[in-house]
């Protein structure tokens, strides 16, 4: 077992367990998108970035292994700035028609937008530019989605 501190809260956690799981299991929310309990952690969404005392820079909490004595911060101005930028970059390539999406109302991306609150409009949305194929009466093939 290892004793780690996340935002001033001491936790007894299994050594080498990823910090994101440790936090979530103890009621500490760290924003994340690409994490799934049945898959190996990637850190590709960059939402779960944290600062570790004694280490330079930031690291993704889903790939960070818990070590005894580790002190972790999840809420700093720099982390908020980095998360907002990562979310804005994700949204530049995301369709804006959420109300027609099957995940509408139960979408992790929408929840992150509400939690982080990006300043939309700073980055221009990339349009993919594909014309929907409507030659089949039953299937709409839209490569823009």
Regions found by a protein language model. Name each.
Residues 46, 55-145:
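Fe-S ferredoxin-like electron-transfer domains
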Residues 5, 24, 114:
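Short polybasic/polar patches that bind polyanions
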Residues 4, 31, 71-72:
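Short small-residue beta-strand/loop micro-motif enriched in glycine and branched aliphatics
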Residues 1-9:
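Eukaryote-biased recognition of intrinsically disordered, low-complexity regulatory segments
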Residues 11-68, 82:
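N-terminal cofactor/phosphate-binding cores enriched in small/glycine residues
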């Amino acid at each position: 077992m290892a004793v780690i501190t996340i935002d001033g809260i001491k936790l007894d956690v299994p050594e080498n367990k990823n910090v994101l799981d440790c936090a979530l299991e103890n009621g500490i929310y760290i924003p994340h998108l690409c994490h799934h309990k049945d898959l190996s952690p990637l850190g590709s969404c960059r939402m779960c970035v944290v600062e570790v005392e004694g280490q330079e820079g930031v690291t993704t909490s889903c790939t960070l292994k818990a070590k005894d004595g580790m002190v972790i911060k999840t809420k700093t101005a720099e982390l908020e700035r980095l998360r907002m930028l990562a979310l804005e970059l994700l949204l530049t390539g995301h369709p804006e028609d959420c109300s027609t999406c099957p995940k509408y109302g139960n979408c992790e991306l929408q929840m992150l937008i509400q939690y982080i609150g990006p300043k939309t409009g700073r980055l221009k949305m990339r349009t993919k530019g594909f014309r929907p194929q409507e030659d089949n009466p039953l299937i709409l093939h839209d490569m823009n989605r």
